[in-house]
Amino acid sequence: MTAKVFYDELHQYALSHQKNGKPYLGEYQDEKNGEWLKGDNPRSSFYNHSTFCDLVINDLIGFKPRLDNAFGFYPLIPEGKWDWFVLDNISYHGRTLKVMWDATGKKYNKGKGLRVYAEGKEIYRAANLKPAIIKLK
């Protein structure tokens, strides 16, 4: 699957998180027409669990846990689609991490590109969103 295909499908999924113009995420949605099939069953509207967050964190942003003292970074964000994001307060292997992307350097005022911090100290920097194994220092 390409980054563009994943991004487009995730974007469509995110847009489906509404019903009658209000935020909503139910249990069953018709894959062809997008209609919510469970109706107004109260149980249905609390069905999100963690899957959407997993898709964003592990797949779109690309944070991939590992057993060693590193993590994989394999983003599926097509070039030019997101100018910025921050994934903060990641509890990982006894450390607190931050993954920050700023295409222009103007959103977070820390410079252009990708930066990774452990305990507030920069441990990795890259000019673009490219796959990497990032070792904790």
Where are these regions (language model features)?
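C-terminal capping/lid segments that line or modulate ligand- or cofactor-binding pockets
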Residues: M1-K98, T104-Y108
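C-terminal beta-sandwich/jelly-roll accessory domains of carbohydrate-active enzymes
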Residues: N89-K137
